[in-house]
Design a protein with these regions (language model features):
Chain B
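Short catalytic/signature loops enriched in Gly
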Residues: 3, 16-23, 28, 231-317
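Conserved ABC ATPase "signature" region
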Residues: 124-141, 194, 250-251
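Conserved ABC ATPase signature
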Residues: 146-150, 154
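P-loop NTP-binding/switch modules centered on Walker-like glycine-rich loops
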Residues: 172, 176-261
Length: 308, 317, 317
């Protein structure tokens, strides 16, 4: 194997630069990146647009239900007379926020558990893996529903807090993270196990390095690639979870919009105003498919075979 | 003067769960069994044996990666599990492609032992890395590069530079040449020799290649199935091997243009370390085996007339 | 192997037991109170009567004790009474299970067939146009929210084309097989489409790997026609492991069924659990959830055992 870059001798051909080049070649992934950027702009425009139009996204107007698109309401109104476009934008903020934060929380938990199990090995590993396997084996949606139905006041929270929007948001983040960390844990554990035996880890140990040093200096940097790929794909999965839960009434509860709960009563208006049934789901679909393509592109870019 | 590293009846036993339908009883794998030897300052001790002999496990124990199940190790006459011992004993591996963290640039790789031991400031470490990189024969600009940009031989040089960084007294080299192309092997071998001469380093040189051992070693230790069967100065060992196993090993080395001295064919295969033969571990394959060999474990004792050469055989020559 | 089976089965029971406690506790955290629900709208109830009622139903006891009583009753076959259906829980579970089984089996079979067709077609020319198109379809399949897919299908087939009914189970006059099929069509289609994506990927990967193997090259050299090779040889080899993986996806399938049943007002396990939770029917919710857990765990166990049987490396652990 010879040095690859004979041209720029003093330039470090770092791993990340190689990856970016490979990623750029993956056209669907690049397109997805653009699509996601567009979606982010779309949801970010909610506040400014509301101010511009002078509208309150939560204001109901039962005299103007199911209105067609007009100058006042660019996409018409929904079943309670609220502006559909604004609700889509704010709903997007909620859905994306839950997606990202739940992924971060669940991912961190999974990372910690995977590292502990993979590096410590032995009894700790066995215990953690039994628990993980137990959770993986459960039917997810019924479990999420039961968790979502929990009455916070019975856990000691005040009634006011229990019914607030913040509680609803954090509840769904916690539930999803609680149930979704297993995929990350398994992945990280496998990576940690394979890293543990590598010679460079042994060399560090021979020089007197302790477990914490090894985990942070060697194992973590080497597992970032599978983590990033898995994390990206998790976001898609989490967005789908949130949408189902909100749709069934156990996630984000109205009046706060989320793409899922906007389809709450969709069966009622699928005949009167099909657009309302199409838009929120379409946005979920586009977001998730873009995220999945992005993850796929990242996976190809991080192909470890060319980086031995 | 106490030796640099002393091993006293050191054993490494692993418990293995049995196979079978209901899981058999636990068995003990004796990778290393009651080995005693010493490595002096500035000497190269070669550790020779076939795969399964336990030489790698022994090397791991000397490098501090594994604690012995029985027996003890001493560093300069004192305790072994100290920070100073870790600094003084460094390791070079067989597989250059696994020995370097692909995410770290060469400068960090070489300086890592210094970071772990807390030696020097960042600037000092960088300077030292630059010095070492040139001493192992690599260009200065290697410092900013990543392992995947280098060949096997070059990576091994980097690994050697890393081992030299904390100014060690002993380097445990576990088959450092085996994975390299033949033409590169001699380069690295010469590098190791010149480094030793400059710095008065000791080597524990683990190898199955007797040709290389002949080139580099001061003393040779021969392992079979975890037991030390012969320990002798290099010249004596090659001229007059005392233990039948050593004799067989030497006879197996092809020599161009010279007829074989004697035919000592070994019968059978190496037994499993899970079920070592009773008495002398070698008796199942030994052409000289007698009843006593099965009954009594031979101790390491000097060969007739050559007090420096120790062999564990009832019929040593 | 026997040890493996026993160990996995024991694990499954342990998880089920733990989950029964967890779910029992969670049900207790649901909004509302069994007593309040019972006395709802009854103005003549005094606090003394409420306390008395609590005593009778054992609701003043601590959680572990209540759980224990429930467990003992459940093991004896008594799962309690369903408040919303005015029937013993067991009598409600039976028909619901049958309905869900109908839906899931049909949906799963359709998915499998579609997946094998699409996956094989995609594997014939990896990287080609057909493969790319199918790839797009699979990505769409794993990215689409099931409930929205159901809505779209309803929009297309029921509202616009009027070919199929939008919901419900059978006509008022219980019009025989054709009517039942018409009502089953959209839910099955929804479920199938949602899962075909993942299954197709498995089949494609397995087929690509199988087609690369030497025995396929031999078959070609023998002069067999391509369709014969693909279907007779490659597909048959890829069949068992792939189907095993598909069986493992039972959990996801069940979640999809839950949503589909709710959307199409089909009275299966999913809708039963959902309604029970919304209606504070604690006994039914608890039993339904546990049953769903049991079935998922059992199918995972079956798949694990099949895997272990197929792959001799695993079964010897």
């Amino acid at each position: 194997m010879t040095a690859i870059d004979t041209g720029a001798i003093d330039q470090a051909s770092s791993v990340w630069q190689l990856r970016w080049r490979r990623f750029r070649r993956h056209r669907t992934a690049m397109a997805s990146l653009v699509l996601l950027a567009a979606l982010l702009l779309f949801v970010a425009a909610a506040g400014p647009l509301a101010a511009l139009q002078g509208l309150d996204p939560d204001a109901t107007d039962l005299l103007s239900r199911y209105d067609s698109p007009s100058a006042a309401h660019w996409l018409g109104t929904d079943e309670a007379g609220r502006d559909e476009l604004l609700r889509l934008m704010y709903g997007g903020q909620m859905s994306l926020l839950v997606g990202i934060i739940a992924t971060l929380v669940g991912g961190t938990v999974g990372l910690a558990i995977g590292l502990a199990a993979g590096y410590a090995g032995g009894r700790i590993d066995a215990l953690l893996m039994r628990t993980t396997d137990g959770i993986i084996a459960l039917p997810l949606l019924p479990l999420l529903i039961v968790l979502g139905a929990v009455d916070l006041t019975k856990l000691g929270f005040s009634s006011q807090f229990a019914h607030s929007g913040a509680a609803g948001f954090w509840r769904i983040v916690v539930i999803i993270a609680l149930v979704d960390w297993t995929a990350m844990a398994r992945l990280v554990r496998a990576a940690a196990l394979s890293m543990k035996e590598r010679d460079f880890v042994q060399a560090a140990r021979a020089s007197g390095a302790g477990p914490l040093y090894i985990v942070f200096a060697h194992i973590l940097p080497n597992v970032t690639t599978p983590i990033i790929v898995a994390g990206t794909l998790t976001i898609g999965r989490v967005i789908l979870f949130e949408s189902v839960l909100s749709f069934l009434g156990f996630g984000i509860v109205p009046p706060t919009p989320s793409w899922g709960n906007m389809l709450n009563n969709a069966q009622e208006f699928v005949t009167t105003d099909p657009g309302l049934a199409i838009y929120p789901g379409l946005l979920i679909f586009l977001t998730v498919i873009a995220v999945n393509f992005l993850g796929d592109g990242l996976q190809h870019a991080f192909d470890p075979r060319s980086e031995r | 003067m106490s030796a640099l590293v002393e091993l006293d009846q050191v054993s490494a036993h692993f418990t293995v769960r049995g196979s079978g339908w209901f899981g058999g009883a636990k068995q003990v794998l004796r990778a290393v069994d009651a080995v005693s030897l010493a490595i002096g300052e500035g000497e190269t001790l070669a550790l020779v044996g076939e795969s399964g002999s336990g030489k790698s496990t022994l090397g791991q124990m000397v490098a501090g990666l594994r604690a012995p199940t029985l027996g003890s190790l001493r560093f300069r006459g004192g305790p072994f599990a100290t920070k100073a011992a870790r600094r003084a004993i460094q390791l070079v591996f067989q597989d250059p492609f696994s020995a370097l963290d692909p995410r770290m640039p060469v400068s960090s790789l070489i300086a890592e032992p210094l970071v772990i031991q807390g030696i020097g400031t960042q600037a000092e470490r960088r300077t030292r890395a630059a010095l070492l990189v040139e001493q192992v024969g690599l260009p200065r600009d290697s410092l900013n590069r990543y392992p995947h940009e280098f060949s096997g031989g070059q990576r091994q040089r980097i690994a050697i530079a890393r081992a030299l960084a904390p100014e060690p007294a002993l380097i445990v080299a576990d088959e450092p040449l085996s994975a390299l192309d033949v033409s590169i092997q001699s380069q690295i071998l010469n590098l190791l020799k010149s480094i030793q001469e400059e710095r008065r380093l000791s080597y524990l040189f683990i190898s199955h290649d007797l040709g290389v051992v002949n080139h580099l070693a001061d003393r040779v230790a021969v392992l079979y199935l975890g037991k030390l069967v012969e320990l002798a100065p290099r010249a004596e060992l090659f001229a007059r091997p005392s233990h039948p196993y050593t004799q067989a090993l030497l006879d197996a080395v092809p020599r161009i243009g010279r007829a074989r001295r004697r035919q000592v064919a070994l019968s059978g295969e190496m037994p499993s370390p899970l079920a070592p033969p009773p008495g002398c571990v070698f008796h199942t394959r030994c052409p000289k085996a007698q009843a006593i060999c099965r009954a009594e474990i031979p101790l390491l004792a000097p060969a007739p007339g050559r007090p420096d050469q120790l062999a564990a055989c009832h019929f040593k020559e | 192997m026997l040890r493996f089976i026993l160990r996995r089965t024991a694990q499954t029971f342990l998880v089920l037991l733990v989950m029964s406690f967890v779910i029992y506790s969670l049900i207790g955290l649901m909004p509302g109170d069994p007593i309040d629900v019972m006395i709802a709208g009854n103005p003549g109830v005094t606090p003394a009567m409420v306390a008395h009622l609590r005593e009778i139903y054992g609701l003043d006891q601590p959680l572990p004790l209540r759980y224990w009583h429930w467990l003992m009753a459940a093991l004896g076959g008594d799962l309690g009474f369903s408040r919303t259906h005015s029937q013993p829980v067991l009598e409600v579970l039976g028909p619901a299970l049958a309905q869900t089984a109908k839906l899931m089996l049909t949906g799963w079979s359709l998915s499998v067939v579609l997946a094998f067709i699409l996956g094989t077609l995609a594997a014939l020319k990896p990287g080609g146009k057909l493969d790319a198109a199918i790839g797009l379809f699979t990505f769409a399949g794993i990215s689409v929210p099931v409930f929205w897919l159901a809505l779209i299908l309803v929009l297309v087939f029921a509202v616009t084309l009027h070919w199929l009914p939008a919901s419900g189970m059978a006509g008022i006059d219980d019009g025989g097989i054709v009517d039942q099929l018409r009502h089953l069509a959209l839910p099955v289609l929804t479920l199938a489409l949602a899962n075909t994506g993942t299954f197709t990927r498995y089949v494609r990967a397995a087929m690509i790997e199988t087609m690369r193997m030497d025995f396929i090259r031999t078959a070609r050299a023998k002069g067999l026609s391509e369709p014969r090779i693909v279907i007779g040889h490659a597909l048959r080899n890829a069949l068992i492991p792939v189907v095993t993986i598909m069986a493992l996806s039972f959990g996801t399938l069940f979640s999809g069924a839950l949503v589909t049943e709710t959307m199409f007002a089909q009275f299966g396990m999913g809708k039963m659990i959902y309604d029970a939770i919304l209606g504070n029917d604690y006994n039914l919710a608890l039993s339904g959830l546990l049953f769903a857990t049991l079935v998922t765990l059992a199918s995972n166990l079956a798949a694990d055992l099949a895997y272990g049987w197929l792959d001799p490396r695993i079964s010897l652990r």
